[in-house]
Design a protein with these regions (language model features):
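Helix-loop-helix hairpins and the membrane-proximal interhelical loops
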Residues: 1-24, 97-100, 104, 159-265
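Short, non-helical or kinked segments that cap or interrupt transmembrane helices
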Residues: 1-9, 23, 44-57, 106-111, ...
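Transmembrane alpha-helix interface/packing and boundary motifs in multi-pass membrane proteins
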Residues: 1-5, 35-47, 122-127, 226-238, ...
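Flexible loop linkers connecting adjacent transmembrane helices
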Residues: 11, 45-73, 98, 201-203, ...
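Alpha-helical transmembrane segments in multi-pass membrane proteins
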Residues: 12, 16, 26, 30-42, ...
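Membrane-interface alpha-helices at helix entry/exit sites of multi-pass transporters
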Residues: 22-26, 64-80, 256-268
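A structural-propensity feature for long, helix-poor, extended segments
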Residues: 32-43, 51, 265-290, 312-324, ...
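Membrane-embedded alpha-helical modules
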Residues: 74-193, 307-324, 328-335, 344
């Protein structure tokens, strides 16, 4: 927690400067894809999301870890992330021109409506605790208003003594880590004072281990969450947290047992992690076709492409031979699973 994917990507840009372009792009893309999943590790094991998009992973991942199923939860998350990334890459290869054209038509009004819809999802996820959910949403919106207004450079709700340090308001990642970490510390401290901690037997009984039966009936959930993540990734500035929340809400709406989500079931974990990695291919679509980064990490990727001699505008059209370096790596993974995807 606290170290982002964009930090790792920025470090690799300087390290891979002298590498062959295929090796450099494959290395950077690998860190980008895997880094998105890595936020789930702390989210599952200690209930602190490593990335903003891992918020919903804590809903079911941590309850599974508390039952002694942490390893199973991590393996479900890894496989779900792989499927989500694979589907988003298929969309990247097949629908880049179409999705890029649609993304360009999204103005500030449409983006506002998407964020507003994401906020209304709070109501759907707060059944039984509506007042608490609405208050949390209102507090989040109020906090986001703090900082400098870009239209007229006026400060909003910023004390005079903090103007130099709060021009951009509160950064999302430190706020999330602080809120989740502090809450978890108080919870652990309270439980430690009330209960005696017994020694836990590390042996597995076989019921808590991972198997592909965990994905029985999850096909629609996998595809739906991947497509949600891909589409949200195409829209610059929307973010992975909105994608994971929307995917989780849809999984809950279409679930046969929605009351179980949030108690530690694979269905919620699959929706969250699939949409997270579905975001990676979607964020690359406007980058490769229009030179517009979909998120902060793809903004760093533009620098990597330029250092490798690739133009930052209309990348796929003018430099397909250099971008080939990102494709064979994925095909090697596909071949290990017994299939491959052809591309020009």
């Amino acid at each position: 927690p606290g170290l982002s994917v964009s930090m790792a990507t920025a470090l690799l840009v300087s390290i891979t400067y002298t590498w062959d372009h295929s090796d450099a792009l494959a290395m950077i893309m690998g860190v980008y894809v895997v880094g998105v999943f890595s936020g789930a590790v702390s989210a599952i094991l200690i209930n602190i999301p490593g990335t903003p998009s891992s918020i919903t992973t804590t809903f079911d991942g941590y309850p599974m870890a508390k039952r002694g199923e942490g390893e199973r939860a991590l393996k479900i998350g890894i496989f779900s992330s792989f499927i989500g990334g694979l589907i988003s890459l298929i969309c990247l290869w097949l629908f880049t021109p179409l999705l890029s054209a649609a993304a360009l038509k999204f103005s500030a009004v449409e983006k506002f409506l998407i964020i507003l819809f994401a906020l209304t999802v709070i109501a759907a996820l707060s059944k039984g605790q509506m007042l608490r959910g609405v208050f949390a949403g209102f507090l989040g919106v109020l906090t986001s208003l703090i900082g400098m207004f870009s239209v007229n450079n006026a400060y909003r709700m910023v004390p005079a003594m903090f103007k130099s340090k709060m021009q951009d308001g509160f950064q999302l990642l430190p706020v999330l880590i602080g809120l989740f970490a502090i809450a978890q510390i108080f919870e652990e401290a309270e439980e430690g004072m009330r209960f005696k901690i017994d020694k836990v037997d590390g042996e597995m009984d076989g019921k808590s281990t991972f198997s592909f039966k965990d994905f029985k009936g999850q096909g629609i959930n996998l595809v739906r969450s991947s497509l949600i993540g891909t589409f949200m990734g195409v829209l610059p500035g929307v973010g992975g947290s909105a994608a994971s929340i929307l995917a989780y809400a849809q999984a809950k709406n279409f679930s046969k047992h929605p009351e179980l989500l949030g108690t530690g079931v694979a269905e919620g974990l699959v929706a969250s992690e699939t949409s997270n990695n579905g975001l990676t291919g979607g964020a690359l679509i406007p980058l490769l076709s229009l030179g517009i980064p979909g998120d902060s990490t793809t903004a760093v990727l533009i620098s990597a492409f330029m250092l490798q001699g690739v133009s930052e505008y209309d990348l796929e059209k003018f430099y397909p031979e250099k971008l080939e370096g990102t494709m064979p790596t994925i095909e090697e993974w596909e071949a290990k699973l017994g299939g491959s995807i052809e591309h020009e």
